[in-house]
Amino acid sequence: MAQVSMRDMLNAGVHYGHQTRYWNPKMKPFIFGARNGVHVINLEKTLPLFNEALAELTRISSNNGKILFVGTKRAASEAVKAAAVDCQQFYVNHRWLGGMLTNWKTVRQSIKRLKDLETQTQDGTFDKITKKEALMRTRELEKLELSLGGIKDMAGLPDAIFVIGADHEHIAIKEANNLGIPVFAIVDTNSTPDGVNYIIPGNDDATRAIQLYLDAAAAAVKEGRGSNVEAELEATAE
């Protein structure tokens, strides 16, 4: 069972919040106190909440659920992509385009264009057009890949989103709320927990903390996928 320990979180600096003057009062239940003008997050609250979230991620993925990892801050971007790829799930790590979930029909058309352009790079189409046109299409492909590359194979809306930084990704959270998609999110002391179904109070800026969240989430998803494969094999054997 994928779990994290108090020591893991302390070592990663999960307990370091923001300066007290930037706090969101809605995070008061999760704050231990302040030290040198910086809020300290109560890890005795975070630990059970995080492990509960991990158990739910495992359950969702064991039912073939799709998890969308979201983290567009510079500190999180590469780690978000790596974690999603590691557990064969999906990600948005560059910029959240408004309507990515709520206007899925339009997004799907853009994904189709992305895949068409990918095909053109391989089937000789680029050899038959002018260099200028080929360059324009290459730039279009790069732009689409940056925005949609992490969801191009998602084939429909996700069953949950795992967010690094509730404050920074508030548009993604709002869209998920509108569609009834469960939201798992790291919520720092300067953020609101509103709209988050599985609140994980913690530092959303430190790279070590971000890596801890993502490693644990990816492990939970892989565990769920593994149990699903085992169940399918048992059913086949019968």
From Swiss-Prot:
Classification via CDD domains:
RPS2
User: Where are the annotated coiled coils located?
Assistant: none
MF terms (GO), sorted A to Z: structural constituent of ribosome
The record ties this protein, via InterPro entries, to:
Ribosomal_uS2, Ribosomal_uS2_bac/mit/plastid, Ribosomal_uS2_CS, Ribosomal_uS2_flav_dom_sf
TM segment ranges: none
- Key word Ribonucleoprotein present: yes
Keywords in alphabetical order: Ribonucleoprotein, Ribosomal protein
Q: According to the lineage, what is the superkingdom?
A: Bacteria
A GO term (biological process) for this protein?
translation
SUPFAM superfamilies cross-referenced by the UniProt entry:
Ribosomal protein S2
GO cellular component entries? cytosolic small ribosomal subunit
Q: Which Pfam families match?
A: Ribosomal_S2
The record's section on PROSITE patterns has: RIBOSOMAL_S2_2
Cite the Gene3D superfamilies for this sequence: Glucose-6-phosphate isomerase like protein, domain 1 (3.40.50.10490), Helix hairpin bin (1.10.287.610)
Task: Note the PANTHER family from the entry.
Answer: 30S RIBOSOMAL PROTEIN S2 PROKARYOTIC AND ORGANELLAR, SMALL RIBOSOMAL SUBUNIT PROTEIN US2M
Question: Which protein family is named in the record?
Answer: Belongs to the universal ribosomal protein uS2 family.
Protein name (record): Small ribosomal subunit protein uS2
| Native organism | Actinobacillus pleuropneumoniae serotype 3 (strain JL03)
